[in-house]
Amino acid sequence: MVDALIIDACRTPRGIGKAGKGALAGIHPQQLGATVLRALADRTGINTADVDDIIWGTSSQRGPQSGDLGRMSALDAGYDVRASGVTLDRFCGSGITSVNMAANSIMSGSEDLVIAGGTEMMSMEGRRGEGPFMMDNGNLRLRARHPQSHQGVCADAVATLEGISRHDVDALGLESQKRAALAIAGGHFNKSLVPVYREDGSLALDREEYPRPQTTMEGLSGLKPAFPAVADVPIDDKGTTYRQLILAKYPDLDITFVHHAGNSSGVVDGSAAILLASPTYAKAHGLKPRGRVVAMANMGDSPTLMLNAPVPATRKVLAKAGLTIEDIDLFEINEAFAVVAEKYIRDLELDRDKVNVNGGSIALGHPIGATGSILIGTLLDELERRDLRRGLVTMCAAGGMAPAIIIERV
């Protein structure tokens, strides 16, 4: 088996994911994806005719984000028509999965040059005009077997079951903001950031738009929990509620609501791309690798609680790599909700100074299908900046899943 080498990674800044407010909200998703694909080709000097495939993550494949966004973005970026593309959906885990699939295709010897990444325009979600989204899409047989609730209600259910308090999740949210502010001020993201321009050539965004560096613990403590109302709103003509879906599996659970906008991931727009190559191709074409993929894993857990798979996914990917927690220098666990990162740190007994060192999605935002690829690129940048060797990225995904990946510098 050959190595899957990481040649380069880039991403857009994350824009506030609200139509009429966010700087990227008026950009077509294909053009946002084209921005990073074009930048990746320019930065590395690759012949795009050599790209075997473009594997793209997009979770909300509706409207302008439908129709194989990976392929369309490549065509819009001016790639050679021989550069094929495919778009996948593993919900929040799509951006890690796209990289894992690209790495697998290279490690198997099937392909030599593959781009992975993702795009998510969350500012478009408000335009759907649909009713409450159900993971089972009305399949009552699946609902009876695996009731699946709203992600925010799941976060509060997990916090209740784990004994994680409002103070705990607020403290993690505040730390995310502090670390992100320091990272931005220190230029930690500059290596990978690609500015986004409108069709008329004017600048749309060249910096992170979502962070709130003025956040304080006092301010967070004054915010009302976001999900009590969501939990008890009827979601079908039978009056079923999101709370009832959790109680179907945990009938004695009295949910304590602790999450709000200040300790949950931000709704944003964004895109990212990562170039991977085989050693043979990289050497023949003068591409200098920055890292390699060490191991990958996927793990499922309770679909009803949804958010608990990152811990077992981490244990699985470490076992595949023959490594231990102590062998990992830095961790990126997506802050979908503060409880996810807090439980992850506690269960694995991690040093907090090694986890999400530049802040996370609470401060920076979570463009669903792109986040995993963003985190992998951010991790590689930080390993280089600190002259460290190895890092691990994982994240929860709807349906009770988590992909994971370990990378190391070369």
Protein language model regions, located:
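Glycine-rich loop/linker segments at domain edges
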Residues: C10-A19, A103-E162, D232
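N-terminal extracellular/periplasmic Venus flytrap/periplasmic-binding protein-like
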Residues: C10-P13, G26-T35, R43, D168-P279, ...
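Active-site pocket-shaping loop/turn-to-helix segments
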Residues: R14-D42, S60-G63, V86-N100, D112, ...
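Conserved beta-ketoacyl condensing-enzyme motif
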Residues: A23-V114, T119-N137, L193-R207, T304, ...
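Conserved catalytic cysteine-centered active-site region
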Residues: I27, T58-D112, F133, R145-V153, ...
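Phosphate/pyrophosphate-binding loops at sites that engage ATP/ADP/AMP, CoA/4′-phosphopantetheine
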Residues: A39-D52, V158, E162-G163, A282-P289, ...
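Condensing-enzyme catalytic core of the thiolase-fold
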Residues: A181-L182, A273-A295, V311-A319, A336-L350, ...
